[in-house]
Swiss-Prot record:
<comment type="similarity">
    <text>Belongs to the oxygen-dependent FAD-linked oxidoreductase family.</text>
</comment>
<dbReference type="InterPro" id="IPR016169">
    <property type="entry name" value="FAD-bd_PCMH_sub2"/>
</dbReference>
<dbReference type="InterPro" id="IPR050416">
    <property type="entry name" value="FAD-linked_Oxidoreductase"/>
</dbReference>
<dbReference type="GO" id="GO:0016491">
    <property type="term" value="F:oxidoreductase activity"/>
</dbReference>
<keyword id="KW-0560">Oxidoreductase</keyword>
<keyword id="KW-0274">FAD</keyword>
<comment type="function">
    <text>FAD-dependent monooxygenase; part of the gene cluster that mediates the biosynthesis of cercosporin, a light-activated, non-host-selective toxin. The perylenequinone chromophore of cercosporin absorbs light energy to attain an electronically-activated triplet state and produces active oxygen species such as the hydroxyl radical, superoxide, hydrogen peroxide or singlet oxygen upon reaction with oxygen molecules. These reactive oxygen species cause damage to various cellular components including lipids, proteins and nucleic acids.</text>
</comment>
<dbReference type="Pfam" id="PF01565">
    <property type="entry name" value="FAD_binding_4"/>
</dbReference>
<protein>
    <recommendedName>
        <fullName>FAD-dependent monooxygenase CTB5</fullName>
        <ecNumber>1.-.-.-</ecNumber>
    </recommendedName>
</protein>
<dbReference type="InterPro" id="IPR036318">
    <property type="entry name" value="FAD-bd_PCMH-like_sf"/>
</dbReference>
<dbReference type="InterPro" id="IPR006094">
    <property type="entry name" value="Oxid_FAD_bind_N"/>
</dbReference>
<comment type="pathway">
    <text>Mycotoxin biosynthesis.</text>
</comment>
<keyword id="KW-0285">Flavoprotein</keyword>
<feature type="domain" description="FAD-binding PCMH-type">
    <location>
        <begin position="78"/>
        <end position="255"/>
    </location>
</feature>
<dbReference type="GO" id="GO:0071949">
    <property type="term" value="F:FAD binding"/>
</dbReference>
<dbReference type="InterPro" id="IPR016166">
    <property type="entry name" value="FAD-bd_PCMH"/>
</dbReference>
């Protein structure tokens, strides 16, 4: 396609659509309109304005542009300067935008690059934005809401999980979503995030019943177990490589309030936590109602503390202080500051727990995530803590500096996913796993340290992986939603899984628009 002229591009689009057998109906008039907008324009943003209308495209001098750029979770994405931002309000708007930008890329070679922003939570630079290109900000996309029988809920990709929970909690229902409020549905579902309920039900992506997707041709299609099932499967973990998800339909399940909260401890108690964590994470069988994160935090003026997240998701009735967590509850608790509680344990709903967890996150800052996995091992948890502490000491005086180490168990019952249909493929971990969600944040004034911190984190993780391999406890797995830009989740999937994903990409995006024109996120390997 890159060698074709515009008239050839336009004339070939119906053929392209027909290549995607059974995907949807192609409407030539829509492409004629997009072509007319491109032909009469001087730039990609000009063409987009003609296609969508001037009220749906904003520029650097507009307040709505500043609001969009300032609302990313990580200020690293605010470093970029898109030429314009499109604010679609329907799947049809997204369709027009994609058709226009696909055609525009051939009139203005090397231009019309675009990013797609749902919730805007992925922290690395360029994940959902682009410099001198276009951002499609899905913030204004509508949500259909809960079904009459409460069995499903359909929401836009920019809807945050706590708003989903709020609707479902009112009906004693829930779904798989992130543990932290404020994160968008789109990225967490296409990246297969983890939930309080993951030991029972698997990954967030495995709860998706239907995707509404805009393909590179501009066609709006449904992908589910019956329609375009290969696309449905690919999007369950395939991230942004196949199209733009404009609506997500999630299955729900019965779930009432449950027991949980946070407990706070002195860093000196960490060895006790590590031993309890190893026992919990190694359990066979694993208690599927047990959710636990051991969190070590450097913050608050320069000291470490521990803030654990404990939930036991059994409800009707809820079970307070269940047997599985009694060893954890014996460890002495210490308020972070005098006058603060030593724990927040109570019976509550998932909306409340997710918002409590989010309240511990400072906005806005520059953030970096990363992930490492190993077999449950208390000694290695201490080793990694010491390595992390040593690696980051040179940065602890940066304004707003915070380091968070989240040790999370991933039992085989979660990793195996009960035969779920998704694009994670077989996860060969030789048993239960502990993975670390690494998060570093600091103030905007310290942006000059971005590259140095990234290099230090890479060196740390390479050394830690080497040590884990030496000890025989390395596990070839990372949680996709916790990966940094240098940790492609696709490097951890089987060859057959990658081949299947690439074949699906070429089927639904034969001109590879989402591989070449959308640089953000994690791209599929070239095979």
């Amino acid at each position: 396609m890159l060698g074709l002229n515009l008239q050839q591009v336009l004339s070939n689009v119906p053929t392209i659509s027909s290549i995607v057998s059974g995907v949807g109906s192609y409407q030539h008039g829509s492409d004629s309109s997009a072509w007319a907008s491109v032909a009469a324009s001087k730039s990609c943003c000009d063409a987009l304005t003609k296609s969508l209308g001037k009220n749906s495209v904003v520029f650097p001098y507009d307040a709505a542009y500043s609001q969009s750029m300032g609302s990313y979770f990580s200020l690293k994405n605010s470093d970029l300067h898109p030429s314009c931002i499109a604010l679609p309000r329907s799947a049809e708007d997204v369709s027009k935008a994609v058709r226009t930008l696909s055609l525009g890329a051939h009139k203005w070679e090397g231009q019309c690059q675009f990013g797609v922003r749902g919730g805007g939570h992925t922290p690395f630079k360029g994940a959902a934005s682009t410099d001198n290109g276009i951002v499609l900000d899905l913030l204004h996309m509508p949500s259909a809401g809960i079904s009459p029988d409460y069995e499903t809920i359909t929401v836009s990709p920019s809807t945050t999980w706590d708003l989903v929970y709020e609707v479902l909690d009112a009906h004693n229902r829930s779904t798989l979503g992130t543990k932290v409020a404020g994160i968008g549905v789109g990225g967490a579902s296409t990246s297969c995030g983890v939930s309080y309920f993951s030991p029972r039900y698997g990954y967030i992506c495995d709860m998706v019943e239907n995707w509404e997707v805009v393909l590179a041709t501009g066609d709006i299609v449904n992908a589910n177990a019956n329609e375009n099932p290969d696309l449905w499967k690919a999007l369950r973990g395939g991230i942004n490589n196949f199209g733009i998800v404009t609506a997500v339909t999630l299955k729900t399940f019965g779930q009432g309030p449950f027991w949980g909260g946070q407990t706070f401890h002195s860093i000196d108690t960490r060895q006790e936590h590590f031993k309890n964590h190893e026992k919990l994470a190694s359990a066979h069988p694993y208690d599927p109602y047990a959710h636990y994160i051991n969190t070590l935090v450097w913050a608050n003026g320069g000291h470490w503390f521990i803030g654990n997240s404990i939930q036991y998701t059994k409800s009707d009735p809820p079970v307070a202080e269940p047997e599985v967590f009694k060893p954890f509850l014996k460890t002495e608790r210490t308020p972070i500051f005098p006058g603060l509680p030593e724990d927040t344990l109570r019976v509550d709903n998932v909306t409340s727990f997710s918002r409590e967890y989010a309240a511990n996150t400072l906005y806005p800052q520059r953030w970096q995530f990363a992930c490492i996995s190993f077999a449950p091992d208390a000694d290695f948890m201490e080793t990694f803590f010491q390595m992390a502490n040593d690696a980051m000491q040179q940065y602890v005086k940066l304004a707003g500096f915070k380091l968070i180490l989240n040790y999370q168990p991933a039992p085989t019952v979660q990793l195996e996913r009960n035969g779920a249909v998704d694009s994670l493929g077989p996860i060969q971990t030789e048993g239960n796993v502990v993975f670390v969600h690494w998060a570093v944040s600091y103030d905007e004034s310290e942006a000059q340290f971005d590259d140095a911190i990234t290099k230090s984190v890479q060196d740390l993780f390479h050394a830690a992986n080497a040590k884990a391999k030496e000890l025989g406890i390395y596990r070839h797995f990372i949680q996709p939603t916790y990966a940094d830009s240098w940790q492609s989740p696709f490097d951890y999937r089987s060859k057959s899984t990658i081949e299947e994903l690439v074949a699906t990409s070429k089927k639904y995006d034969p001109l590879q628009v989402f591989q070449k024109q959308v640089p953000g996120g994690f791209k599929l390997p070239q095979i």
